[in-house]
Amino acid sequence: MQPLVILAIVALVVTLIIAIVVWTIVFIEIRKIRRQRKIDRLIDRIRERAEDSGNESEGDTEELSKLVEMGHDAPWDVDDL
């Protein structure tokens, strides 16, 4: 094989590896952002219900605690972006 053909094949393989790594990172970040949005919506619902009724909703609080146990210790301190 000619050196140019070998170089082209190596370049394609390296490009493929880089693309896989980049898309994996993008997928992980999208999952983090979606989870954070879900946590933010739950916190907003808890605040609204607390203002309306004077106490927090048990169901929303339990759901929020499940999300926090899945990976976020402090959902209001996430610096993903």
UniProtKB/Swiss-Prot annotation:
Q: By its UniProt entry, which InterPro entries does this protein fall under?
A: Vpu, Vpu_cyt_dom_sf
Q: Which intervals carry biased composition (Acidic residues)?
A: 53-62
Membrane-traversing stretches: 8-28
Cytoplasmic topological segments: 29-81
Which keywords accompany this UniProt record?
Answer: AIDS, Apoptosis, Host membrane, Host-virus interaction, Inhibition of host innate immune response by virus, Inhibition of host tetherin by virus, Ion channel, Ion transport, Membrane, Phosphoprotein, Transmembrane, Transmembrane helix, Transport, Viral immunoevasion
Kindly list the GO molecular function terms attached to this UniProt entry.
CD4 receptor binding; monoatomic cation channel activity
For the modification Phosphoserine, the affected residues are: S53, S57
| Region of interest: Disordered | 50-81
Give the quaternary structure: Homopentamer. Interacts with host CD4 and BRTC; these interactions induce proteasomal degradation of CD4. Interacts with host BST2; this interaction leads to the degradation of host BST2. Interacts with host FBXW11. Interacts with host AP1M1; this interaction plays a role in the mistrafficking and subsequent degradation of host BST2. Interacts with host RANBP2; this interaction allows Vpu to down-regulate host BLM sumoylation.
User: What protein name does the entry list?
Assistant: Protein Vpu
